[in-house]
Amino acid sequence: MASDLDIARASRLRPIGEIAAAAGIPAEALIPYGRYKGKVDGGFIRSLEDRPDGALVLVVGISPTPAGEGKTTTSIGLGDALRAAGAKAMIALREPSLGPCFGQKGGATGGGRAQVAPMEEINLHFTGDFHAITSANNLLAAMLDNHVYWGNELGIDPRRIAFRRAIDMNDRALRQTVLGLGDGANGAAREQKFDITVASEVMAIFCLARDLDDLQRRLARIVVAERRDGSPVTPADLKAVGAMAALLRDALQPNLVQTLEGTPALVHGGPFANIAHGCNSVIATRTALKLADIVVTEAGFGADLGGEKFLDIKCRQAGLAPSCAVVVATIRALKMHAGVAKADLGAENPGAVARGAANLRRHVAAMRAFGLPVIVAINGFVTDTGAEREALRAALDEDGGARICFCTHWADGSAGATDLAQAVIETIAAKSARFAPLYPDDMKLPHKLRTIAQRIYGADDIELSPLAAKRLARFEAQGYDHLPVCVAKTQYSFTADPARRGAPTGFTVPIRDARLSAGAGFVVALAGDVMTMPGLPRIPAAEAIGLDPDGAIHGLF
């Protein structure tokens, strides 16, 4: 069987200028980065402001399993199928992080016949956006320590420096480090923790900013430390905002690429959904909505993580309102949620499908809690049987049902998602969405967390550690109680325990810590043992990546 990379390389891509023209982007507004990728000029984007928005389709998954769900693949297949059906459609996705590419998950450009391309360029350096974000983040960290070194005019308390350095790599050795060792010329020694770039506040700001002015306002609001009197220190105090914005200026223009079938795709920004808010940039999404009648976008992991954050954070801040949600699952993954071992997934097991469907039903219910009509997309495998598909239909009918479409876009491209595209078109036309965020702005922070835990995760309650309770109370006293909350939690379960698959009941969600992201405009609550700097697995994917004698990359997936 051909690999995703082989399929991508065998496809004939169109010059990026042709893709731009098909999307309604004039040649003078395209900034080419080679033959097959480019950026969209910010001035052109501003000129679109008065155009009406198209319909927004949000794609989410179930709780992920090692069997894979294919959410990005489905987003791409749906976009291609909508285009094939005659709709003026675009796709808006996140950029991949190097950490997962070299770690366990692999890249994030889809799979099979449903990919965005050029695959290896997008998965690796792409247009340099993540380098710019990492550089801006670490410039701020350097200027902060430099200020303390040169006399500390602002009276920063070194014990209350909160801002972290970042790197776009899975590197557990950087979770807890000590800076400034050696003589005094290296600065004062202090503890420092690193985040992966996609979990940093600068990444979140990049993805939530509406334009360069908004970007600078948000950067200026980051709380990097506290003075000895407890007052906050910001990049504005350190005179760092201008230089950070200069590093981010070009990166803030969204990236244009194409699917293997030539559908225009804006791929821009990439916060993780388990340890950050998990959505592509507001600028890319809004640009696509001005250019297309239907925009397909995704949120990371399940409805409980990226889905909830897309709707409670991104939509709240950007004024977006999806027309419907698509929840992606596989029959194989549902079997795993019922306890079937990965080695046994190929054997027919309708009973396991019915039991595992409880996880899917909870994700469907989560999207309905926001007033969205839901379509279920089953990403098909050759091992799926008719009996298993019927068992799934029956299981979904238990809760009033959801429209279900069985898809084969991995193997067949747009032709394999025709039914899904038609379901989306009909759902948009019905105008049945009644979108509303899950909680009001004026709800207290612990109550916002409790609302998410009970209505989305199915928990009985939350349990705040003394540290988390203290920090949430402090944030409220400082005037941040109006902000939405961003829960950092394992993606593998509705609980904080990654081993509890399916749809658990009778549990509480432990909140061990909280962080303020004043620039991004939310409060991060850390549930369980989730970490904001991942590590590599025992056998990282990087071991299989290399170059052939002609210099072509192999081993990416």
Swiss-Prot record:
InterPro entries: Formate_THF_ligase, Formate_THF_ligase_CS, P-loop_NTPase
Enzyme class per UniProt: ligase
Listed GO biological process terms: tetrahydrofolate interconversion
Alphabetically ordered keywords of this record: ATP-binding, Ligase, Nucleotide-binding, One-carbon metabolism
Biological or metabolic pathway of the protein: One-carbon metabolism; tetrahydrofolate interconversion
Source organism, top-level taxon: Bacteria
Residues involved in ATP binding: 65-72
CDD domains referenced in this protein's UniProt entry, alphabetically: FTHFS
Reaction(s) catalysed (UniProt annotation): (6S)-5,6,7,8-tetrahydrofolate + formate + ATP = (6R)-10-formyltetrahydrofolate + ADP + phosphate
GO molecular function: ATP binding; formate-tetrahydrofolate ligase activity
Enzyme Commission identifier(s): 6.3.4.3
Annotated PROSITE patterns: FTHFS_2 (PS00722)
HAMAP family with a match to the protein in the record: FTHFS
Family named by the database record: Belongs to the formate--tetrahydrofolate ligase family.
Protein name as it appears in the record: Formate--tetrahydrofolate ligase
UniProt source species: Acidiphilium cryptum (strain JF-5)
Lineage: Bacteria, Pseudomonadati, Pseudomonadota, Alphaproteobacteria, Acetobacterales
